[in-house]
């Protein structure tokens, strides 16, 4: 099967998956493919769903979105605790609509869990009652993540062993699940939902730039974001006084820039923290995809298009 012509029909390949670290050129590749094939670009990044953070999350520009259909970008308010489960539900509707129109779905982003949900399935954890979530968060603020990790170790040792004791979000999530449902997060993962797109029906590529060049691009892009009024974007968000544990409030650069707006640190220091956090995230993305989704073909950004065109659906 050669090329990526939509005329081949959905039987040839159901979707293209383009992953990679932040600032690796994923969006440009996806847009180019969408223009070539008449495809639909579908966001697979957990931060680009938020309408309030177009600049700081490097969402496609309005001009880029006008060149091809883009879905699941900026459709969620920052006040929403948007989850992988919510994204799967939204993506299912978009995927079905796209395939019904005989168009190529092009999933693009850097959120490994979203891609894993596409090709491997997702755990079927039920909604957590607000009173349980609020109680766990209050204890997190009062006692700290390490204390909650010790509690988790007693009631869900298997999950606790996989988590860093200082990982506030994941420790709190695991604890609220076991306290709300009486089952461990590990058990829920074992009884997960089926994959939306089995791996054998997709072409999947991971853009793997040379590290030093990637880090230089990350640093330059953060400066460009500030020049494009990312600080004003964060200021508007800060005025709403949202829960700092919400996903949007933890986007790279947001906490540091809020500290600057409060007068706690200089803008230069906030930018330094934002750049460092983004570089560390990119490093984790390399590691995560290598171990969790080995079916993705790794390619240099300049070669990724050719790799996709040569690849057989796996």
Swiss-Prot record:
Extract the Pfam families matched here: IPPT (PF01715)
- What protein name does the entry list? tRNA dimethylallyltransferase
Its subunit composition reads: Monomer.
Q: What is its EC number?
A: 2.5.1.75
Q: Which GO terms describe its molecular function?
A: ATP binding; tRNA dimethylallyltransferase activity
Q: Which domain of life is it from?
A: Bacteria
Per the record, the similarity remark reads: Belongs to the IPP transferase family.
Q: Which InterPro entries match?
A: Dimethylallyltransferase, IPT, P-loop_NTPase
Q: What does this protein do?
A: Catalyzes the transfer of a dimethylallyl group onto the adenine at position 37 in tRNAs that read codons beginning with uridine, leading to the formation of N6-(dimethylallyl)adenosine (i(6)A).
> Which major enzyme category is it?
transferase
Query: Where are the stretches annotated Interaction with substrate tRNA?
Result: 45-48
Report the record's Gene Ontology biological process terms: tRNA modification
Site positions for Interaction with substrate tRNA: 111, 133
Q: Which organism is it from?
A: Nitrobacter winogradskyi (strain ATCC 25391 / DSM 10237 / CIP 104748 / NCIMB 11846 / Nb-255)
Cofactors (names): Mg(2+)
Name the residues that bind substrate: 22-27
Please give the catalytic activity noted in the UniProt record.
adenosine(37) in tRNA + dimethylallyl diphosphate = N(6)-dimethylallyladenosine(37) in tRNA + diphosphate
**What keywords are assigned to this protein?**
ATP-binding, Magnesium, Nucleotide-binding, Transferase, tRNA processing
Which residues does the record give as ATP binding sites? 20-27
SUPFAM superfamilies for this protein: P-loop containing nucleoside triphosphate hydrolases (SSF52540)
Keyword DNA damage attributed: no
